[in-house]
Amino acid sequence: LRRLDQLVQQNGGPIDIVGWSLGGIMARLLALHHPDRVRQAISLGSPIRVEDPEANLSESVRRLSQLAGLQRGRRGHDLTEIPVPSTVIYSRQDGVVAPASCLQPVGPTAENIEVRGAHIGLGHNPAAVWAVADRLAQRDGEWAPFEPPSAMAWCYPDPDRAPEPVPRPAGT
């Protein structure tokens, strides 16, 4: 938190936090617990909602994790709703994280942007990088949903075909 405070002070106010995979979870945790210091959170390929830790993994990663005993004792989490503007960038071809575990409910300052590509390449994916740059360029208090330039529309699959988010358990 000391580093977060330093960055907020250097910036003269809340900062944008961009995170890939686990970094996206950390970005959303900071936004959840310190919304006065975070202007917006952008996550790339981050499983922000996990009821069953094994359910958010691709089949191949799930098998490797089971062989290595990496899943024992892990608990779920739900970071789908945070009190700052947020963008989720995900891919149905991720290969590591189940796409549905990356999605958040869409709202006035919350969106999901699908790109084509693998988990490991999201930080270098031109469509993902363009979307992140567009989100970061927004002025304070003027958040608007992402609209790709018409020449790049083919880079972003139809949002109406997005996978259903991981359902919430009854009573939550």
Spell out what each predicted region is.
Residues 92-97, 120:
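Acidic catalytic loop of the alpha/beta-hydrolase fold
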Residues 98-105:
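Short alpha-helix in the alpha/beta-hydrolase fold that links the catalytic acid
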Residues 116-122:
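Histidine-bearing beta->alpha loop at or near hydrolase active sites
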